[in-house]
Amino acid sequence: MADAIGIDPGSYKTVLACVKQRGIEIVLSETSSKWTPTIAGFTAEERLVGDAAINQMKKNFKNTAMFFGRFMGLNQDCVKQLEEENKFITYKQVEMENKKIGFELTIRGEKHILTPE
């Protein structure tokens, strides 16, 4: 069992590691990769992350969230940067309380607002 874990969430890939007796060990993904794609897809039946989300992305593009790490720490006052980042997303961006950023996705037939944090 690990005493501590480390998570490095990047815009494109996420790396997980844990501390073991012999040192730090990278946690392998379902496909035995040292990193997992930073992406989540929502279908009528399930939530998919990583490689599974990539596999369904073509048929479910509007409900597949990716690049959300690029929006962390931004708010609606960051107009120029938001305009640039919005070129990379296919889901709807909405303004929330306190000028926070939210993303509208359909999950199991219902609209939900998710935040990048």
Which positions does each model-derived feature cover?
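N-terminal phosphate-binding loop and flanking beta/alpha elements of the actin-like ATPase fold
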Residues: M1-P37, F42-E117
